[in-house]
Structures are given as structure tokens and as C-alpha cells.
């Protein structure tokens, strides 16, 4: 049963990614409560997904139900700040690269927008034949702090690919939103065991 669910989840994601390519979809969450499927689409442009009077969502629901073979429910969640969502930032950079915008300008714009909206730090990494160069290379741009080794750091990471006339350019984005301090049980430090006192020897007179 798990294998079947995994396969249908993959097909649902594939279908939605293709259908909603222009709807700025950040992520798709699939849940399976008792013989049904619930799909939550996180998007920056809910109007495009919903369509006129909810027509488009109804079409999606029918197709998802057919793929999964169980009744489907589709929820739309709006992403309020797309500039602070790593997937949407990466997709925005790739769409600019495909429109032949200079890669440095696209990177800088994304970084400035994220920092303006309250990100603690952001790093953008692009690799490939940048600017149509013969030899592929990697360039990155960072502003603020991006602590990748700090476990409590809330870092949003995602990737995207730009298909240009020169080949594929990979884009990676890390956005540092702050540190998660609550929610973790504090580990009590064990008290050091009492050291036995050394008996002082009386010196010989």
C-alpha cells in the first residue's frame, strides 16, 4: 500500500508541477486521511490556481482524484512573502536567466529584496555556462549571516534549473530567517560527583 501511495503521490506532484508552472508554487503537501487524499498547494498567486469562480481548482481536484483513485480535496495556502521563500526566489532567478537577464543582476535583485523584507541572511549560488562562457563555473553572492552548521538556525533551502540556449544553469538559494530557540527540551547538566577529600598527612616533626 505504501508503494502505491508513493507512486500516486509522485504522479500527483508531477501533474500539478506541470499544470501550475506559472502559478508561483512554493510547495505541495499531500496528506492521506482515511481513504482520501488532501493536497495543500502553497502558492504566491492563489488567483491563478483557483481560476474564475473556482473552476480551475475543480478541474485539478477531478484529475487528482482520478490519479489517486480516491476522493480528493484541494486546499490553497497563500505565501505572503514570496521574496523570503527559497523555492520562489530560485524560480524567479531561473525565469530571469531564461529571459537573458544578466545573472549578476538577477542574483543581486533577489538578495536585496529578501534583505529588505527582513531576512537575517541570504546566499545565492549559480553554476553553469554563465553569460554563455565556454567553461562552466560557479558564482555566489551572500548578504547577512547564513550559518549552515548551526542546528537551531531556521534556513530555507531550495534549488531550480534554468534551461538556456547555452545549457542548464543550476540555482541554489539559502535564506536564513533567524534561530529557533523554543520547543526544544533543555537538557539538564548532571551535577559533578562530590570529590572525596584527600586527607592531609601531618608532616613529621
From Swiss-Prot:
Keywords attached to this Swiss-Prot or TrEMBL record, sorted alphabetically, are:
Ribonucleoprotein, Ribosomal protein, RNA-binding, rRNA-binding
Asked if the record carries the keyword rRNA-binding, the reply is: yes
Q: Does the keyword Iron apply?
A: no
Q: Which InterPro entries match?
A: KH_dom, KH_dom-like_a/b, KH_dom_type_2, KH_sf_prok-type, Ribosomal_S3_C_sf, Ribosomal_uS3_bac-typ, Ribosomal_uS3_C, Ribosomal_uS3_CS
**Any one Gene Ontology cellular component term annotated for this protein:** cytosolic small ribosomal subunit
Q: Which Pfam families match?
A: KH_2, Ribosomal_S3_C
Q: Where in the numbering of this chain does the KH type-2 domain appear?
A: 12-80
**Subunit text:** Part of the 30S ribosomal subunit. Forms a tight complex with proteins S10 and S14.
* Its biological purpose: Binds the lower part of the 30S subunit head. Binds mRNA in the 70S ribosome, positioning it for translation.
What the record says about family reads: Belongs to the universal ribosomal protein uS3 family.
The name on file for this protein is Small ribosomal subunit protein uS3
Amino acid at each position: 500500500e505504501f508503494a502505491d501511495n508513493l507512486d500516486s503521490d509522485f504522479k500527483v506532484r508531477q501533474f500539478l508541477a506541470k499544470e501550475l508552472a506559472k502559478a508561483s508554487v512554493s510547495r505541495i503537501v499531500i496528506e492521506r486521511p482515511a481513504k482520501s487524499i488532501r493536497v495543500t498547494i502553497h502558492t504566491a498567486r492563489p488567483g491563478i490556481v483557483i481560476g474564475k469562480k473556482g473552476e480551475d481548482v475543480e478541474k485539478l481536484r477531478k484529475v487528482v482524484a482520478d490519479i489517486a483513485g480516491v476522493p480528493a480535496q484541494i486546499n490553497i495556502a497563500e505565501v505572503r512573502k514570496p521574496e523570503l521563500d527559497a523555492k520562489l526566489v530560485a524560480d524567479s532567478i531561473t525565469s530571469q536567466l531564461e529571459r537573458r537577464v544578466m545573472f549578476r543582476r538577477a542574483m543581486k535583485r533577489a538578495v536585496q529584496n529578501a534583505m529588505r523584507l527582513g531576512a537575517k541572511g541570504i546566499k545565492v549560488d549559480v553554476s553553469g555556462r554563465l553569460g554563455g562562457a565556454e567553461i562552466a563555473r560557479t558564482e555566489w553572492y551572500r548578504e547577512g549571516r547564513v550559518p549552515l552548521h548551526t542546528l537551531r538556525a531556521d534556513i530555507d533551502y531550495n534549488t531550480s534549473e534554468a534551461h538556456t540556449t547555452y545549457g542548464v544553469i543550476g540555482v541554489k538559494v539559502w535564506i536564513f530567517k533567524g534561530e529557533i530557540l523554543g520547543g526544544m527540551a533543555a537538557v539538564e547538566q548532571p551535577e559533578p560527583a562530590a570529590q572525596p577529600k584527600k586527607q592531609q598527612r601531618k608532616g613529621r616533626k
